A protein has these predicted regions:
Chain B
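Noncatalytic alpha-helical scaffold of FAD-dependent oxidoreductases
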Residues: 1-497
Length: 412, 497, 440
C-alpha cells in the first residue's frame, strides 16, 4: 500500500483529487497512533500529513494557537505549557490504552475528540476548535470558523470536524483555544463507596458552587492492575472517589474545606496535592488501569457516555453481568469498561444496557477481527443515521476519506 | 428595502387561499393568521430596517403540528421562515412574501428540570431568562445571557448560537446545549443527543446550533445548567482614553484571569444607559469597563485586588466595586439595556456585531471613529471586551432621507474592517440578512459551497429560510457534483514510501 | 421606529403625542417578556410590541379600527408591565388610551357587546346602581350554571361574560359606609389633613377598607375628609374608551378637590384603590389640552398619593404584631407598574411586624384589570389561576393587596383571607383583625 507523504495543503488537494479520479479510498494519518480505533478501513493508500507540522502562530494573550494539523500534540503541549497555558479539555493520551508510541498529532486529537476529566467544566475538543483549513472529499481546500471565539459566521463546520475520525475532510491547519493553567490543584478522595453511592457523591460535588473540575470513581477492582500514579492509591484498598479543585491556592484551600463539608455524608476525605493530584488525573485521563501494557491489556475496552446521574447504576450492573471492570469519569457520565475477551466483546448486552440508561457506547479497543464484525461506534436511530450519512456525503460523496472506519458496512 | 430576497413564487401566491385552508386544518383555532392587518406585526424582528409581511403566519401548539406544516410545505414547495421571539438583530426572522412565517411562541413549557444531571429540557419558546428563573430556587442558572435574555427565546438562542456578557467564561449557547428535537423540512422529527455530555457520531447538535433556522425547526432543547457561583462582584472602571481600557483588557487576560464578564462602553453609550438606569455611571470618562469576577468568596477577593492593580497600572480614573448583589445588578442593568436605551438619544439605531482579536480593539475603535466622521452619523460603542466582540450602535433617523442607507454603508465598512483586522463578520447576532452580502469578504466561493452542501443534507429543496446567511442559492444537485481533475492516477512529485 | 405621519396629522396634539411615543419604540421586544397576554398566548399580536405596531398603522393610515385591531387591543389589560420593562421609555399607556378612544368613536361593536359595555359604564361608577346590581346578581347566581363555560373562542360571547360577572358578585353586601361630606377629626394633635377618595365599586364591596384607612389616619393625627360631590375617578370609563365620560368626571373631581383644598386645606388626596390612583395621577396629562382645567388637573395629580406613599412619611405607632402572620404581598399592576410603587407597601408591612413574602411572577397581572375579568373572562381566569398557584407556593396566612379589583379577583379562587394592606396596618396599630373580603 502506498503511503503519500504530503508537504502542504496543495499536495493534499492533489492526492485527494487523484484518489477521487481513480476511486481509491485513502486512509488519513498523522502519526498513525490511533489507527486501531474504528473499523479496519477499506482503503488503498495512506495519506500521511505528518510533514505539515509547523506552528503557524501562537498568541498567548489572545488565547489562541494556530498550527498545521500534523504537528505532534506533545510538542504543542510543551510549547503552550512554557507560557503557562494548556488545552483545557485535557486531551487523552491514547498511547497508554492502545500501546502505541507517542500521542500523535493535533489533527488526530481533533479527529478523535477524546477529552479528559476536565470536560465536565471546560467542554470537549469541539469546544476549543475555533477554525480550520481542510481539504474536503471533493478535493477542494476550504476554511471554516476563524481565529476568535465569538464567531457565528456561517455554519459551525468545526463542530463536525471534531470527533469525525477523519471521515469528512483532511485538516491542514487549525486554530485552537488555549486557556491559562491553574495555579494549583488539590484532589479530595473518598474511599470505600460502592458505584451507586459514589455517583451520588459526585453528583453532590458537581451540584455545588465549588467549581469541581474533575469527578472520577475507581472501584477497587480497578486497582488490580494499578501502575504508576494509581499504585499509591491502590494501597487504600477499597474504591476511591476523586474530586478535583483547581485555581489560585487560597481559593482551592477554601473550597476544599467547603467541599469536604458537603461530602461529609459520604465519609471523611483525604487530600492529594499538586503533583500527586496531577499524576492521578493523568492516569484517569489515560485509563491506566486498562493499559495495553497492563494486566488487562488484552481485554476489549468500551467507552460509554451516559447521563451522569445514571452512570453508577449502569456501570455496576454491567460489570456484574459481563464480568468486566469499570472506571468512572465525568461525574459518572463517562464509563470505561474492560471486559473479559469474547469475540463480540459482548456488544449486544453492553449496548442494550447503555441505551436503556440513555447513553451510547463505542468499542475503543478490540482485536481487529472483533472490529470487523462488531459495530465500533454506537449504531444510530434510523433518521439520525440517514442524516449523518447525508452530512458525510456533503463533504465526501465518494467516501474517499477513511472509508469504512465509522460504519460497520463500508458505505458506497 | 436594499437587500434582495429570493424571487417570489407566483404559483404559490396564486394558491394562497387553498394553502391557508390546508394550514387551518393542521393548526386549528387562532393559530393561522392571514389578514393583512394582523400579519403586518410579523413583518420584522429586531432589525426594523427590513420589513416584509409573510404570505401567512402559523403558530403551532405541538411538535406534531410543526411536522405536518413542514411536510405540507415541503410537498407543495412552499418556503418557511421560523421565528422565536422576534428579537433577532440580524433579520433572521424576516418573512418571505411567498412564505409561511412559522412562529414557535406557543411552545412555552419547561418540560423537565433534572438537577441530578444538571440539565433542563425545554420547549423553544421559553425565554432565556425564564430557564434561569425556573432553577434559581436550587441555586442553579443557565449561563449564556444575551442582553435580550428577558425576551429572547431559547430556540432562537440555539439558532443564532447566542452569546452574552458571561460567555467569556461560560461559553456560548453551543457550549451549553446537549441535545434537541428538530423537525426537518420534510416533516421528519429527529432526536439529537440528550442528557449525556456528548453524542455519538457526528456532532449534529454542534452544526444545528448557529444554523439560523436553515437546517430545521427546533421543538425541544436540552440545556446544561450550572450551580451559581458562591459570589459575584463587579468592578466599574473608567478610563480617560479607550486605548487605555483596551490595554487593561489585554493585561487582565494576559495575567491568566478569565473574568465572568468583561464589557466596555464608550461615552455616548454610557450616557444613554445612565439616563435609563441611574446606576451612577461616570459621565466624564471616555471608556467604562465593567468587569465581573465570580467564584468562591476567597477567590473573588483575591482577583478583585489583582484586577484593580492592573487597572490602576493602565491609568484608570475611576473605580467602583460592587458591595452587594443589588449593586452588582445595577452596574449591569445599564449595559444590558444599552441597546434599547440608545432609543432615548436617537429614534433609530443599527446595532452592528463583529469580532476582532482583543489586541486590535484600539485600532478598530479608531477606524470606527473615522467612519463616523465619513458618514456623518453618531455611534455609541458597547462591547464584550473580553472576547473582542464589538457592538457599535450606529445612530440614525429613519425619517430623514438617506440616513438609513448611510447607516448601512457605515455598518458594512465596520464589518469589513473586522475581517481586515483578523476577525469575523458576526460574533453572536448571526448573519441573517444583515450581513449576508458580506459573506464573500470572509469566505471564498469554495468555502461557501461547502457550507451550502451541508444545507442540502438537511433541506434538499432549499425551502427553509432561503435568502438568509448565504448570498447566492445553488441547487443541491449542482453543488453535489464532484469535479474529477485531470484523471491522473498519481502525482510523481509527492514523496511516497 | 420610523413613523409616517403627515404634517397635517401632526398638528393634532394627540397624534403629536403618539408620534413621540412611537418613535421611542425600537422594536426590541423586551416588553413581550412581561406581557400577561403574550405569556399566555405566544402571539405577537397580543403583545405590547404588536399592539404598538397595530396602533401605529391605524393612526398613520387614519383608518377606522378593524375587528382584528379591536380584538387585540381589547385583550390588553393595561397592566403596564411593559412600561416597567421597556428600556426606551415608550409611554404605552398614553398610546393605548388613545387607541381605545378611537375604537369607541370609530368602531361599531356588535349590539350585544355595545349594550354590555354601556351597562358597565353606566352602573359601575354609580354606587347606588352598583349596589342594586350586586343584589340582583346574587339572586341570579344560581342560574349561572346554565351559562356557557370557558371555550377557546376568539372573542367571548355575551352569555360567557355575564357568567363571569355573576361569579364576581359577593355572597353578601356589607352596610354602606359614611357618605360624602363627612369629616373625621384627628385624635389628639392634628398634624395634617387629607381627602380620602371614596371610590365607586370599593365603597359598595368593601367599605371597611376606607374605614381602616380613616381609623389609621385619625389615630395618627390626620384629619380625613370625604369630599362632597366627589365622583368615580373615571378609570372604568376611561379604559372602556368612553373619553367623554371619563374627562367629565375628571373635571368634576378636580373642581371639588380644588374647592376643598382652598377651603380646608389638603396635604394630599389619598387613594386606597391603586387602579384609581394611577388615573388620578394622570389627570394632568388627560386634561393638558383643556385650557380651563389643565393647571388645576396638574396640581391635583401632584396632590394624589397612594395611601402607602403617604404612610411612609408618617411615623406609625409601635406595632402590636408579633411576627407570626405570614403575608403574601400581591403587587397590584396599577401600583407597581402604573405608579412605580414596589417596595414601599412591603416595607411598611414588614416594619409593622408582618412576615412578608414575595409572590413568584409578581410582575404578572391577576387578571382583574378593571372590567377585564368581565369582558375577557377566559384570559382573566387563566391569569387568576396562575396568580393563585404562585401565591400558594409561599404558603401565606393572608394575602394583602392595594387594589379592590385584585382583591375580588384573587378571593374568588382561594380560601386564604384576602385583605387590603391598609387593613393590616390598621390592625397592627390598634385596629381590629380583618376578615377576608366578601365575608363581612
Amino acid at each position: 500500500m502506498d503511503t503519500l507523504k504530503v508537504r502542504d495543503a496543495k499536495d493534499v488537494e492533489e492526492v485527494v483529487r487523484a484518489a477521487i479520479a481513480s476511486e481509491q479510498p485513502l486512509e488519513v494519518i498523522g502519526h498513525g497512533t490511533r489507527r486501531a480505533i474504528g473499523h479496519p478501513m477499506a482503503t488503498n493508500a495512506v495519506l500521511d500529513v505528518s510533514d505539515l507540522n509547523a506552528v503557524t502562530a501562537y498568541e498567548p494573550n489572545e488565547l489562541i494557537i494556530t498550527v498545521q494539523a500534523g504537528v505532534p500534540l506533545a510538542d504543542v503541549q510543551s510549547l503552550i505549557d512554557s507560557k503557562n497555558q494548556q488545552f483545557a479539555f485535557e486531551p487523552m493520551n491514547t498511547s497508554v490504552l492502545l500501546g502505541t508510541s507517542g500521542n500523535g498529532t493535533i489533527g488526530g486529537m481533533i479527529g478523535a475528540g477524546l477529552a479528559g476529566p476536565r470536560r465536565i467544566r471546560a467542554g470537549g475538543a469541539r469546544d476549543h476548535l475555533l477554525g480550520a483549513h481542510a481539504v474536503s472529499g471533493f478535493g477542494d481546500s476550504f476554511k471554516t470558523g476563524g481565529r476568535v471565539v465569538k464567531n457565528v459566521t456561517g455554519y459551525d463546520l468545526c463542530k463536525l470536524l471534531a470527533g469525525s475520525w477523519g471521515t469528512l475532510a483532511v485538516m491542514t491547519e487549525v486554530t485552537l483555544k488555549v486557556m491559562p493553567k491553574p495555579e494549583s490543584e488539590r484532589t479530595l478522595m473518598l474511599s470505600g463507596l460502592d458505584d451507586v453511592t459514589a455517583n451520588k457523591a459526585m453528583t453532590a460535588a458537581l451540584g455545588s458552587p465549588y467549581d469541581v473540575s474533575g469527578a472520577a470513581h475507581l472501584p477497587n477492582s480497578a486497582f488490580r492492575s494499578a501502575t504508576g500514579a494509581l499504585a499509591g492509591l491502590a494501597a487504600q484498598g477499597p474504591a476511591v472517589t476523586l474530586l478535583r479543585l483547581e485555581g489560585i491556592a487560597a481559593s482551592v484551600a477554601d473550597r476544599a474545606t467547603s467541599l469536604a463539608r458537603t461530602l461529609a455524608p459520604f465519609g471523611s476525605v483525604e487530600m492529594l496535592q499538586d503533583t500527586a493530584s496531577a499524576a492521578a488525573w493523568g492516569a484517569i485521563r489515560d485509563v491506566e488501569p486498562f493499559a495495553a501494557g497492563g494486566a488487562l491489556g488484552n481485554w476489549p475496552v468500551w467507552r460509554i457516555v451516559c447521563p451522569p446521574a445514571a452512570g453508577g447504576a449502569l456501570g455496576q450492573a454491567m460489570a456484574r453481568e459481563t464480568g468486566g471492570d469499570v472506571i468512572y469519569d465525568w461525574g459518572g457520565g463517562l464509563i470505561w469498561a474492560a471486559l473479559p475477551p469474547k469475540s463480540d466483546a459482548q456488544a449486544a448486552l453492553v449496548r442494550q444496557r447503555v441505551e436503556a440508561a440513555g447513553g451510547h457506547a463505542a468499542l475503543i479497543r478490540a482485536p481487529e477481527e472483533t472490529r470487523r464484525k462488531v459495530a465500533v461506534f454506537h449504531p444510530q436511530a434510523g433518521g439520525v443515521a440517514a442524516l449523518s450519512q447525508r452530512v458525510r456525503h456533503s463533504f465526501d460523496p465518494k467516501i474517499i476519506l477513511n472509508r469504512g472506519r465509522m460504519l460497520l458496512i463500508a458505505a458506497t | 428595502m436594499a437587500i434582495m430576497m429570493p424571487a417570489a413564487d407566483q404559483a404559490v401566491l396564486d394558491r394562497r387561499g387553498e394553502i391557508v385552508t390546508a394550514l387551518r386544518a393542521i393548526v386549528p383555532g387562532e393559530g393561522v393568521i392571514d389578514s393583512a392587518a394582523e400579519m403586518q406585526v410579523y413583518e420584522s424582528d429586531g432589525l426594523t430596517a427590513y420589513r416584509q409581511p409573510p404570505m401567512v403566519v402559523v403558530l403551532p401548539d405541538t411538535t406534531e403540528q410543526v411536522s405536518q406544516v413542514l411536510k405540507y410545505c415541503f410537498e407543495q414547495g412552499i418556503k418557511v421562515v421560523p421565528r422565536g421571539s422576534g428579537t433577532s438583530l440580524s433579520g433572521g426572522a424576516l418573512p418571505l412574501s411567498d412564505g409561511v412565517l412559522l412562529g414557535l411562541g406557543k411552545f412555552k413549557r419547561i418540560r423537565e428540570i433534572d438537577f441530578d444531571n444538571r440539565v433542563v429540557v425545554t420547549e423553544p419558546g421559553v425565554t432565556n431568562l425564564a430557564i434561569s428563573q425556573a432553577v434559581a430556587h436550587a441555586g442553579f442558572y443557565y449561563a449564556p445571557d444575551p442582553s435580550s435574555q428577558i425576551a429572547c427565546s431559547i430556540g432562537g438562542n440555539v439558532a443564532e448560537n447566542s452569546g452574552g456578557v458571561h460567555c467569556l467564561k461560560y461559553g456560548m449557547t453551543t457550549n451549553n446545549v446537549l441535545g434537541c428535537e428538530i423537525v426537518l423540512m420534510s416533516g421528519e422529527i429527529l432526536r439529537i443527543g440528550g442528557k449525556a455530555a456528548e453524542n455519538s457520531g457526528y456532532d449534529l447538535m454542534g452544526i444545528i446550533t448557529g444554523s439560523e433556522g436553515l437546517l430545521g425547526v427546533i421543538t425541544e432543547i436540552t440545556v446544561r445548567i450550572l450551580q451559581k457561583p458562591e459570589t459575584a462582584r463587579a468592578l466599574m472602571v473608567g478610563f480617560a482614553e479607550v486605548e487605555a481600557a483596551g490595554e487593561c483588557v489585554a493585561r487582565i487576560i494576559g495575567a491568566g484571569i478569565i473574568p465572568g464578564g468583561m464589557e466596555m462602553m464608550d461615552k455616548p453609550a454610557i450616557h444613554a444607559a445612565e439616563a435609563f438606569v441611574h446606576a451612577g455611571y461616570p459621565l466624564d470618562v471616555d471608556a467604562l469597563l465593567i468587569i465581573e469576577l465570580d467564584g468562591p468568596g476567597v477567590e473573588v477577593d483575591e482577583l478583585i485586588k489583582r484586577v484593580e492593580t492592573i487597572a490602576q497600572g493602565c491609568g484608570s480614573t475611576t473605580c467602583q466595586i460592587s458591595t452587594s448583589e443589588a449593586e452588582r445588578n445595577l452596574f449591569w442593568a445599564g449595559r444590558k439595556a444599552a441597546f434599547p436605551a440608545v432609543g432615548r438619544i436617537s429614534p433609530d439605531y443599527l446595532c452592528m456585531d463583529g469580532t476582532i482579536p482583543r489586541g486590535a480593539l484600539p485600532k478598530a475603535l479608531a477606524r470606527i471613529r473615522d467612519l463616523s466622521e465619513k458618514y456623518q452619523l453618531g455611534v455609541a460603542n458597547v462591547f464584550h471586551a473580553g472576547d473582542g466582540n464589538l457592538h457599535p450602535l450606529i445612530l440614525y433617523d429613519a425619517n430623514k432621507p438617506g440616513e438609513i442607507e448611510r447607516a448601512e454603508a457605515f455598518g458594512a465598512d465596520i464589518l469589513r474592517a473586522c475581517v481586515e483586522f483578523g476577525g469575523v463578520l458576526t460574533g453572536e447576532h448571526g448573519v441573517g440578512i444583515e450581513k449576508r452580502d458580506l459573506m464573500p469578504e470572509m469566505f471564498s466561493e469554495v468555502d461557501l459551497n461547502q457550507q451550502q452542501r451541508l444545507k442540502c443534507a438537511f433541506d434538499s429543496q432549499g425551502l427553509l429560510n432561503p435568502g438568509k446567511v448565504f448570498p447566492t442559492l445553488h441547487r443541491c444537485a449542482e453543488l453535489g457534483r464532484v469535479h474529477v481533475h485531470g484523471g491522473k492516477l498519481a502525482f510523481p512529485d509527492i514523496p511516497r514510501f | 421606529m420610523k413613523t409616517e405621519f403627515s404634517l397635517a396629522q401632526l398638528a393634532d396634539p394627540d397624534i403629536a403625542v403618539a408620534d413621540k411615543i412611537l418613535r421611542a419604540c425600537v422594536h426590541c421586544g423586551f416588553c413581550t417578556a412581561t406581557c400577561p397576554t403574550y405569556v399566555l398566548l405566544g402571539d405577537e399580536l397580543d403583545s405590547p410590541r404588536g399592539r404598538i405596531y397595530l396602533i401605529k398603522e391605524m393612526l398613520e393610515k387614519d383608518r377606522p379600527p378593524t375587528a382584528e385591531v379591536v380584538k387585540h387591543i381589547d385583550r390588553c389589560l393595561s397592566c403596564l408591565a411593559c412600561m416597567t420593562t421597556c428600556p426606551s421609555g415608550v409611554h404605552y399607556m398614553h398610546l393605548v388610551d388613545q387607541a381605545r378612544v378611537r375604537i369607541e368613536r370609530d368602531y361599531s361593536r356588535p349590539l350585544a357587546e355595545r349594550a354590555l359595555r354601556a351597562v358597565l359604564a353606566l352602573v359601575l361608577p354609580r354606587p347606588g346602581l352598583f349596589r342594586a346590581s350586586m343584589i340582583m346578581a346574587r339572586l341570579a347566581r344560581p342560574f349561572a350554571a346554565l351559562l356557557p363555560a370557558s371555550n377557546a373562542a376568539a372573542t367571548p360571547g355575551l352569555l360567557r361574560r355575564i357568567k363571569a360577572m355573576l361569579a364576581l358578585a359577593p355572597n353578601s353586601l356589607p352596610a354602606p359606609g359614611p357618605s360624602g361630606g363627612s369629616v373625621f377629626a384627628a385624635i389628639g394633635e392634628r398634624r395634617g389633613r387629607v381627602a380620602l377618595l371614596q371610590g365607586c365599586a370599593q365603597q359598595v364591596l368593601a367599605p371597611r377598607i376606607n374605614q381602616a384607612a380613616i381609623n389609621l389616619l385619625t389615630r395618627h393625627g390626620i384629619e380625613v375628609v370625604l369630599v362632597r360631590d366627589e365622583q368615580c375617578c373615571g378609570a372604568l370609563t376611561h379604559h372602556l374608551g368612553h373619553d367623554g365620560d371619563a374627562l367629565a368626571r375628571a373635571r368634576a373631581n378636580v373642581t371639588v378637590w380644588q374647592k376643598e383644598a382652598e377651603q380646608g386645606g389638603l396635604d394630599a388626596i389619598l387613594v386606597t384603590a391603586s387602579g384609581c390612583g394611577t388615573v388620578i395621577k394622570d389627570y394632568g396629562f388627560m386634561l393638558r389640552e383643556d385650557r380651563d382645567f389643565a393647571q388645576g388637573a396638574a396640581r391635583i395629580s401632584a396632590l394624589a398619593k397612594d395611601i402607602t406613599e403617604y404612610l411612609a412619611g408618617l411615623s406609625l405607632a409601635p406595632s402590636r404584631q408579633k411576627g407570626d402572620v405570614t403575608v403574601a404581598y400581591h403587587s397590584a399592576c396599577s401600583l407597581q407598574h402604573g405608579q412605580k410603587i414596589t417596595g414601599l407597601p412591603k416595607e411598611l408591612l414588614s416594619k409593622n411586624g408582618f412576615v412578608v413574602k414575595d409572590v413568584p411572577e409578581s410582575h404578572l397581572c391577576c387578571g382583574s384589570a378593571g372590567t377585564y375579568n368581565i369582558l375577557q373572562p377566559d384570559i382573566a381566569s387563566r391569569l387568576r389561576d396562575r396568580k393563585i398557584a404562585n401565591i400558594a407556593t409561599v404558603k401565606p396566612d393572608m394575602i394583602a393587596a392595594g387594589n379592590i379589583g385584585c382583591m375580588v379577583q384573587i378571593a374568588g379562587g382561594t380560601s386564604v383571607p384576602v385583605v387590603h394592606t391598609i387593613e393590616l396596618l390598621d390592625w397592627a396599630t390598634g385596629g381590629p383583625k380583618p376578615g377576608s373580603i366578601g365575608q363581612d
